[in-house]
């Protein structure tokens, strides 16, 4: 890989984790510059050494950001298919970029008196205080000084950042990163060189991509060029007039709303310019709709400062000015202004905008009620009242006798999951128009979601509903019982098993029963629960023809096997003609041992090919199982079938250890001459003196006249 390629990849990786680095500085240690410098330096060192950051016990608040950075590095290297031998070079170059760029900015930041000094000063005063009133005064003074201190730091930091950005004067347009990367042309950028902060901030985000791997900064400029069909420079001009402070909300990791609104021409860059920098992020947090314009976003996002400015400048589109002034009063909880608007009624449009969950945090729901027509906004009001657990408003909606659809009630019940308000749950479930088994757009029912979020009380309540369907399959072909089993929700399985209408042996699309799923998932406690049900079936077959017992043996699940064993016919053959004992010879010695302890086990049962367990073990050269079988009191060691006796099979398979075990078995009734001939044949087989392996050993007559070396041979076999 070329050096230039390494640098480019390192720059992209830097851009990928830049958001996390900024979060550490702005959100975790916003004013603590020493900690900023220490923690970012630590991250730089860790990335340089291994590409992975170890959690720092001195700063546990960094854990989440460290996890995200580590995952981002892993995902990026995997996506780019970076060769292992190049990774260390990439890590070192990335750490250098962080050090020379991000960390350097922190180091150059002016540091004021540390907050710890203020804390120490006021702690000394508190220790000297003699009364609670005196302590309260000291604490209040401390709060005021801290506020002033933080304000001064914030102002100084902002000024420093602006100076740093502004001082990066662009002297060679062709060498500017935006031009070199082909994001803008020299001609497009030249008229706006004076906006150094914006241009240089855009460069910081140049390597951030969207889901289609398109650089977000590039996407931003493409939107600007195509916004006005007959004037490609107009929106570009509006973009270049923006403050650098708004860049993160335009192309940061959480900028999807604004980009979507711009892309669909619902808002313009001029609209964004009218939004206060501190409020722009709120637009990225709301749930936007296809008909939203800038004022819709401002109201839904509680951008009250921006809204005031738009009212003052008359940029209110088709909205009524009085309505918007009332909205501001609601946001500010201004009782005097609200009283002045007693006669004002909010339109259905504004009422619905205010009843989004984001905006509704900004005002008192009870204040809003006097200004809306409940019939116009019944659905949105029901959702918001449920979210804020306002049972009185919910009852007020119902008392108006508005027709509420089942899907609306279902959605309200979903919302209530977050609070588990039993009164609201009972009230909403009591509606006759409710279809409790209705699927939402994702194919889930109320019961599905209650199980997913482990809401035991809600599951219990839903199961008691007269119309609940417990055997209904979801869009993936699974029942709620299977869902609870897969999620290992033992208490919910208990609740489901108490339902009389439950079909406990119902198969899914793979012909697997709930019991088989629990076994395959190694859910021992759930298996015990299912086995306790009176209607459980143990021998149901899946699409491969295997039963629960087959899978227990195949997967060597000994503990589950012990639980299953009392319920099974231990000598029943499976579809391949094997008994559990024979099946375990190939799969599980632990299960094999457990089966041998059963008094009803048939250790001599032949499979469909006519082989006994002992013969299978001999063919498999499994000396451990041969020894275990020979120790069983019912084992037959001299019975002859189409494969001969066990002794003959041992010789034919050249198994020295098995021969010793058989010859020493008390049920082997042979004289010394016969033993000598067996040993001779075995030695001949080992030495390949028997040339034709196709002739079964049972067809070779024992030569009882051969006695030479008998004592020596017997002694070598421990006889």
From Swiss-Prot:
One of its GO terms (molecular function) is RNA binding. It comes from Rickettsia bellii (strain RML369-C). ANK repeats lie at residues 377-406, 408-438, 442-472, 476-506, 510-540, 544-572, 576-605, 609-639, 642-672. This is Putative ankyrin repeat protein RBE_0319. It comes from the Bacteria. The lineage of its organism: Bacteria, Pseudomonadati, Pseudomonadota, Alphaproteobacteria, Rickettsiales. SUPFAM superfamilies: Ankyrin repeat (SSF48403). Keywords: ANK repeat, Repeat. GO terms for biological process: RNA processing.
């Amino acid at each position: 890989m070329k050096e230039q390629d390494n640098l480019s990849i390192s720059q992209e990786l830097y851009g990928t984790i830049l958001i996390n680095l900024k979060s550490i500085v702005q959100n975790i240690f916003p004013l603590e510059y020493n900690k900023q410098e220490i923690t970012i330096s630590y991250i730089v060192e860790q990335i340089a050494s291994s590409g992975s950051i170890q959690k720092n016990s001195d700063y546990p608040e960094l854990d989440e950001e460290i996890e995200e950075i580590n995952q981002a590095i892993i995902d990026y290297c995997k996506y780019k298919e970076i060769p292992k031998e190049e990774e260390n070079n990439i890590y070192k170059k990335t750490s250098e970029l962080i050090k020379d760029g991000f960390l350097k900015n922190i180091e150059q930041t002016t540091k004021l008196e540390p907050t710890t000094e203020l804390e120490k000063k006021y702690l000394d005063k508190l220790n000297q205080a003699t009364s609670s009133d005196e302590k309260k005064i000291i604490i209040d003074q401390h709060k005021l000084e801290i506020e002033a201190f933080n304000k001064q730091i914030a102002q100084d930091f902002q000024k420093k950042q602006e100076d740093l950005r502004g001082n990066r004067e662009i002297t060679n347009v062709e060498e500017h990163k935006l031009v070199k990367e082909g994001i803008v042309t020299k001609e497009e950028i030249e008229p706006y060189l004076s906006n150094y902060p914006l241009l240089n901030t855009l460069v910081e985000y140049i390597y951030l991509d969207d889901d289609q791997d398109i650089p977000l900064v590039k996407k931003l400029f493409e939107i600007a060029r195509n916004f006005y069909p007959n004037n490609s420079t107009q929106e570009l001009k509006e973009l270049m007039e923006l403050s650098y402070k708004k860049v993160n909300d335009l192309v940061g990791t959480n900028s999807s709303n604004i980009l979507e609104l711009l892309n669909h021409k619902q808002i313009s860059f001029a609209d964004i310019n009218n939004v206060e920098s501190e409020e722009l992020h709120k637009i990225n947090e709301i749930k936007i709709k296809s008909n939203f314009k800038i004022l819709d976003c401002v109201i839904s996002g509680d951008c009250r400062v921006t809204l005031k400015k738009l009212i003052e400048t008359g940029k209110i589109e088709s909205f009524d000015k009085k309505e918007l002034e009332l909205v501001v009063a609601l946001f500010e909880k201004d009782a005097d202004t609200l009283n002045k608007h007693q006669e004002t009624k909010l339109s259905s449009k504004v009422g619905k905008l205010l009843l989004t969950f984001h905006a509704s945090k900004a005002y008192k729901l009870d204040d809003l009620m006097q200004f809306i027509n409940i019939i116009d906004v019944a659905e949105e009001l029901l959702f918001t009242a449920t979210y804020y657990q306002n049972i009185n408003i919910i009852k007020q909606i119902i008392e108006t006798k508005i027709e509420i659809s089942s899907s609306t009630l279902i959605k309200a019940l979903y919302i209530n999951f977050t609070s588990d308000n039993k009164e609201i749950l009972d009230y909403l479930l009591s509606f006759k128009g409710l279809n409790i088994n209705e699927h939402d757009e994702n194919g889930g029912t109320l019961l599905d979601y209650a199980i997913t979020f482990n809401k035991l009380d809600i599951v219990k309540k839903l199961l008691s509903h007269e119309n609940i369907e417990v055997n209904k399959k979801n869009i993936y072909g699974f029942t709620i019982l299977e869902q609870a089993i897969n999620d290992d929700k033992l208490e919910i399985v208990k609740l489901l098993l108490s339902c009389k209408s439950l079909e406990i042996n119902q198969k899914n699309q793979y012909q697997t029963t709930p019991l088989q799923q629990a076994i395959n998932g190694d859910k021992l406690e759930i298996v015990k629960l299912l086995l306790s049900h009176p209607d459980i079936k143990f021998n149901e077959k899946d699409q491969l023809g295997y039963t629960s017992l087959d899978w227990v043996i195949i997967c060597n699940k000994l503990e589950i096997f012990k639980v299953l064993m009392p319920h099974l016919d231990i000598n029943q053959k499976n579809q391949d003609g094997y008994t559990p004992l024979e099946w375990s010879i190939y799969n599980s010695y632990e299960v094999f041992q457990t089966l041998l302890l059963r008094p009803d086990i048939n250790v001599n049962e032949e499979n469909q090919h006519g082989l006994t367990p002992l013969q299978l073990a001999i063919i498999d050269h499994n000396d451990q199982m041969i020894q275990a079988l020979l120790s069983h009191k019912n084992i037959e060691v001299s019975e002859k079938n189409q494969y001969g006796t066990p002794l003959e099979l041992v010789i034919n398979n050249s198994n020295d250890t098995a021969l010793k075990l058989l010859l020493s078995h008390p049920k082997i009734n042979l004289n010394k001459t016969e033993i000598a001939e067996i040993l001779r044949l075995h030695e001949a087989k080992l030495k390949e003196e028997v040339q034709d392996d196709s002739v079964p050993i049972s067809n070779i007559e024992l030569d009882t006249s051969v006695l030479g070396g008998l004592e020596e041979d017997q002694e070598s076999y421990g006889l």
